[in-house]
């Protein structure tokens, strides 16, 4: 199985980017992982929230193939413990999913088109985080999930 994380907009904070790069490298020992950044939409001042979500949705859809399984990182998604998330990853691998795609949306969330296309939603927390920090937290949780599946000493119960 391959895992792809799609996010809108680049990470401006160099310290965060360094950590994202570190966990991305660590994760590559367990699974093929790609972080794909969609550039911020230009001239958003001239767009309504729904128009911006639609444009971002079109860009997200252009990055997907027909066989991808799409999971949205969404505040209303299902929450997991780290162990529960690792079990969910194992189920996806066992089910024969070729590419599991997680998406961090733009500042206003996702368009209805994206919600309809998604096979699931995951929430990292009831708290709100910057989208740049969500990238780091999520990639770290992927890494943690794979160390749990391999019974490696990174995660402590």
Swiss-Prot record:
Cellular localization per UniProt: Cytoplasm
UniProt entry keywords in alphabetical sequence: Cytoplasm, Methyltransferase, rRNA processing, S-adenosyl-L-methionine, Transferase
GO cellular component: cytoplasm
InterPro entries: Alpha/beta_knot_MTases (IPR029028), RlmH-like (IPR003742), tRNA_m1G_MTases_N (IPR029026)
Keyword Nucleotide-binding carried by entry: no
GO MF, any single term: rRNA (pseudouridine-N3-)-methyltransferase activity
Classification via Pfam families: SPOUT_MTase
Subunit text: Homodimer.
Family: Belongs to the RNA methyltransferase RlmH family.
Function: Specifically methylates the pseudouridine at position 1915 (m3Psi1915) in 23S rRNA.
Protein name per UniProt: Ribosomal RNA large subunit methyltransferase H
Organism name: Flavobacterium johnsoniae (strain ATCC 17061 / DSM 2064 / JCM 8514 / BCRC 14874 / CCUG 350202 / NBRC 14942 / NCIMB 11054 / UW101) (Cytophaga johnsonae)
């Amino acid at each position: 199985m391959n895992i792809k994380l799609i996010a809108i907009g680049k990470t401006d904070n160099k310290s965060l980017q360094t950590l994202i790069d570190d966990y991305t490298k660590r994760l590559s020992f367990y699974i093929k992982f790609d972080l794909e950044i969609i550039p911020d939409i230009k001239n958003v001042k001239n767009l309504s929230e729904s128009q911006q979500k639609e444009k971002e949705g079109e860009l997200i859809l252009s990055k997907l193939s027909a066989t991808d399984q799409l999971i949205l990182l969404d505040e209303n998604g299902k929450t997991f413990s780290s162990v529960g998330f690792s079990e969910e990853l194992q189920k996806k691998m066992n089910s024969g999913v070729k590419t599991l795609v997680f998406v961090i949306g733009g500042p206003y969330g996702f368009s209805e088109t994206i919600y309809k296309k998604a096979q699931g939603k995951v929430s990292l927390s009831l708290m709100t985080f910057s989208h740049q920090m969500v990238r780091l937290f999520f990639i770290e949780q992927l890494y943690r999930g794979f160390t749990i599946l391999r019974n490696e000493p990174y995660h402590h119960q």
